[in-house]
Design a protein with these regions (language model features):
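Short, acidic/polar
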Residues: 1-7, 39-44, 75-86
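C-terminal alpha-helical cap/extension of soluble enzyme domains
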Residues: 110-167
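A short, acidic, amphipathic alpha-helical segment used as a generic capping/interface helix at domain edges
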Residues: 85-86, 103-113
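Structural recognition of alpha->loop->beta junctions
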Residues: 10, 41-52, 84-93, 134-155
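Catalytic beta/alpha-barrel core
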Residues: 11-21, 31-59, 64-77, 91-102, ...
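A short acidic, amphipathic alpha-helical/loop segment
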Residues: 2-3, 22-26, 57-61, 107, ...
């Protein structure tokens, strides 16, 4: 978290499955990710970022929400991706899928067109890295990069993303 706060990232993610508190982010836009159940008491007073709660439904608590689905086993059809993400009751729907072949990659690309809500679509693994580089092609609100160790297969460092330019 300290590395992320000291970086020139546009936004940082604080994963509360890896930390036990939300550190001072110095006013940077922040995504606080809860993988073990939402606990509002862990958020600092006046929190003004996003909360990612997986696919858990949250009551309206006045905080922007991200629902996320991760499939490390592969990529479902584009129709399944669209149906799942459009059902998510959040401000932004996130889907991250392990890309095994070009068919999986095509499924992610095809899903980006018909999605009705704000979203982040990512491919994981070596073949999925292109979705992180060309994230604007998918209509993504943002993408994820690391400043220390990757937290997902195929995730690039912030330095690598900056070298590749804004896409």
């Amino acid at each position: 978290a300290d590395l992320a706060c000291a970086s020139d990232a546009d936004m940082i993610e604080i994963r509360l499955d890896l930390l036990d508190h939300v550190p001072d982010t110095g006013g940077m836009e922040t995504v606080v990710t809860f993988r073990n159940g939402f606990d509002a008491s862990l958020l600092p007073k006046g929190f003004n970022g996003y909360v990612d709660v997986g696919e858990e439904a949250l009551p309206d608590i006045g905080i922007r929400t991200i629902s996320s689905h991760h499939d490390f086993g592969g990529t479902p059809s584009s129709a399944e991706i669209v149906a799942r993400l459009d059902r998510m009751e959040s401000d932004i729907a996130k889907g991250a899928y392990f890309v095994r072949d070009f068919r999986d990659l095509a499924g992610i690309l095809e899903a980006s067109g018909p999605l009705k809500k704000e979203h982040v679509l990512l491919g994981m693994g070596p073949m999925g890295t292109i979705t992180r580089i060309r994230q604007s092609t998918l209509g993504n609100n943002f993408t994820f990069a690391h400043v220390g160790e990757p937290t997902a297969p195929g995730q690039l460092s912030l330095e690598e993303m900056r070298a590749l330019g804004e896409n």
